[in-house]
Amino acid sequence: MASGPSRTAAEEYRPNRYVSLPAELDPATYDTPLEKRRAEAERLAIRARLKRQYLLQLNTPKPPRVIEDPALLRWDYARTHNVYPTFRPTPKTSFLGAVFAIGPILFWIAAFKTERVSSAGGVEHQGAPGCKT
């Protein structure tokens, strides 16, 4: 008597406590939850819409002078306006921050102080006309 169909290697695989389960055999790889699939479909729809918008700007008979690439705008925003998640304070950045924050203030204080001292020292006190001092 022949037994039922033989099991495949994936069905016979049992996880080992020393080795993690390969991604190919992990059911979570294939059985994604509905909300995760919806979020992924939404991201793909946004990406397709942005790509279509860019290609329409690029391939019009009278293209605008500046063609805005949404991916480039997002990259530029992430690079310039969103620096705090990737910023690491080091002695160099702390020193440069202090120099650029306090340096101009000290410069203008010194400039006005020396100007006031030099202009006050050159002018001698003169009394009113006809008044002897």
UniProtKB/Swiss-Prot annotation:
Alphabetized UniProt keyword annotations: Electron transport, Membrane, Mitochondrion, Mitochondrion inner membrane, Respiratory chain, Transmembrane, Transmembrane helix, Transport
Membrane-related topology note: Single-pass membrane protein
Subcellular location: Mitochondrion inner membrane
GO CC list: mitochondrial inner membrane; respiratory chain complex I
Pfam families on file: NDUF_B4
Family annotation (InterPro entries): NADH_UbQ_OxRdtase_NDUFB4_su (IPR009866)
Regions crossing the membrane: 92-112
Origin: domain of life: Eukaryota
Function text: Accessory subunit of the mitochondrial membrane respiratory chain NADH dehydrogenase (Complex I), that is believed not to be involved in catalysis. Complex I functions in the transfer of electrons from NADH to the respiratory chain. The immediate electron acceptor for the enzyme is believed to be ubiquinone.
Family: Belongs to the complex I NDUFB4 subunit family.
Subunit structure and binding partners: Complex I is composed of 45 different subunits.
Protein name, per record: NADH dehydrogenase [ubiquinone] 1 beta subcomplex subunit 4
Gene name of the encoded protein: NDUFB4
